[in-house]
Amino acid sequence: MKIIFLVLMMILSEVYSDRDGYPVHDGTNCKYSCDIREKWEYCTPLCKRRNAKTGYCYAFACWCIGLPDEVKVYGDDGIFCKSG
C-alpha cells in the first residue's frame, strides 16, 4: 500500500510541478531586463504570456513565479547570455 501511495505522489508531483526563475529570450539565454521602479508593470504581463502565475522585476530582470517546466529559464543552458 505504501508503494502505491509513493508512486501516486511521484506522478502527481510531476503533473503539477512548476518553477520560478528568470525567463530568457529564445536562443540567447539572456534575461528580460526591467526597471525596478516599475516592479510589476512590465514583468507580470511578460510572465503571464509564458503561462506563469505572476512576475515582477527583481535585480533588474523579470522574475516569474509558477512557470511551466517547458519554459526555459536563466541557467538551463548555462549561465552566459549569448547576444548577437
UniProtKB/Swiss-Prot annotation:
Annotated LCN-type CS-alpha/beta domain residues: 19-82
Any Pfam family hit: Toxin_3
Signal peptide, first to last residue: 1-17
Keyword tags: Amidation, Disulfide bond, Ion channel impairing toxin, Neurotoxin, Secreted, Signal, Toxin
Tissue expression pattern: Expressed by the venom gland.
Subcellular location: Secreted
Molecular function via GO: sodium channel inhibitor activity; toxin activity
Keyword Signal listed: yes
Taxonomy, superkingdom: Eukaryota
GO biological process, one term: defense response
Disulfide bonds: 30-81, 34-57, 43-62, 47-64
Gene Ontology cellular component terms for the protein in this record: extracellular region
Note: Negative results: does not inhibit Nav1.1/SCN1A, Nav1.2/SCN2A, Nav1.3/SCN3A, Nav1.4/SCN4A, Nav1.5/SCN5A, and Nav1.6/SCN8A voltage-gated sodium channels. Does not show toxicity in insects and crustaceans.
Family label: Belongs to the long (4 C-C) scorpion toxin superfamily. Sodium channel inhibitor family. Beta subfamily.
Summary of the function given for this chain in its UniProt record: Toxin with unknown target. In vivo, induces severe neurotoxic events in mice such as excitability and convulsions, leading to the death of the animals within a few minutes after injection. Exerts very strong cytotoxic effect on a mouse brain tumor cell line (BC3H1) (IC(50)=5 mg/ml). It exerts its effects by inducing a stronger necrosis than apoptosis in BC3H1 cells.
Free-text note regarding domains: Has the structural arrangement of an alpha-helix connected to antiparallel beta-sheets by disulfide bonds (CS-alpha/beta).
Name of the protein described by the UniProt record: Toxin Acra3
Organism: Androctonus crassicauda (Arabian fat-tailed scorpion)
Lineage: Eukaryota, Metazoa, Ecdysozoa, Arthropoda, Chelicerata
